[in-house]
């Protein structure tokens, strides 16, 4: 089980610091990150947080690190911790069957939630 109180500040810092690097009009704006990306980035820097939970992806099932992060973040949309800046979006599933990642992982073809912190 995920300790959200321990994980939440790590996720908030990731969302605060993830900005696009385009050189155009939108340079430096905060980007959306999928729950899967957040899980990978948290695990990369803080592997003890994930514990024995699988990261997620195709065939892993509902009890994964990325699913728990997505659930907790979705509960925080209107909460005070993220100061009303947390935004959720959904990535189209079209074409995802062709995605592959290092280690042979494939994304789940369920809803693909994405999160970012709005600039206010």
Predicted regions and their residues:
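An amphipathic alpha-helix signature
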Residues: 32-43
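Phospho-regulated, low-complexity intrinsically disordered regions of nuclear gene-regulatory
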Residues: 1-29, 36, 48-120
């Amino acid at each position: 089980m995920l300790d959200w109180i321990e994980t939440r500040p790590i996720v908030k810092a990731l969302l605060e610091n993830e900005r696009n690097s385009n050189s155009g009009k939108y340079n430096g704006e905060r980007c959306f990150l999928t729950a899967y990306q957040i899980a990978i980035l948290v695990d990369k820097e803080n592997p003890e947080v994930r514990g024995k939970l699988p990261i997620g992806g195709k065939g892993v099932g509902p009890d994964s690190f990325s699913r728990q992060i997505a659930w907790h973040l979705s509960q925080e949309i209107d909460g005070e911790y993220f100061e009303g800046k947390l935004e959720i979006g959904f990535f189209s599933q079209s074409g995802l069957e062709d995605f592959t990642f290092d280690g042979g992982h494939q994304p789940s073809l369920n809803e693909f939630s994405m999160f970012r912190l709005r600039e206010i």
